[in-house]
Amino acid sequence: MNWRHHIIRLTESEKARAGKIDASFFPPVEESRLAEWEQKNEIYLPEEIRSYLLQSEGLEAQRGEAWPVLPLDQWDVLRDECASATPWVHFGETASHRYLLSTGHSPSIYRCKTFGSNEEFFAATFSRYLELVFRGEA
């Protein structure tokens, strides 16, 4: 998938225009750097997110008000065996929420309030997550 074209299409939607939700892209992550990050963190990212990172390291929206995809060096791997058998990856945020990737057998995206602890299901896939962001639902 060409993520830039997909996201530009999302910014042209009626809701994105009404909410002035724009997008800024970054240079791609080199595959060797991404593989090194995965090995260091003992995580293999879902193909959908890997393919995005290989096209753009981050995604800024609303002129810095939202970061649907933080630059890779700002991602946090959260390991809490009491809460989840698999690690979570904090990869995006807005002023009110942090976005977490569940790395279990069915990777999904959850969100939690920035100053809260209860996560809630947000999207089943990365592309659905981006659709919700650009509809102003993040």
Where does each model-flagged region fall?
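Compact, glycine/acidic-enriched structural inserts
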Residues: 116-135
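Intrinsically disordered, low-complexity regulatory segments enriched in Ser/Thr/Pro
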Residues: 107-114
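A surface-exposed partner-binding patch
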Residues: 1-105, 137
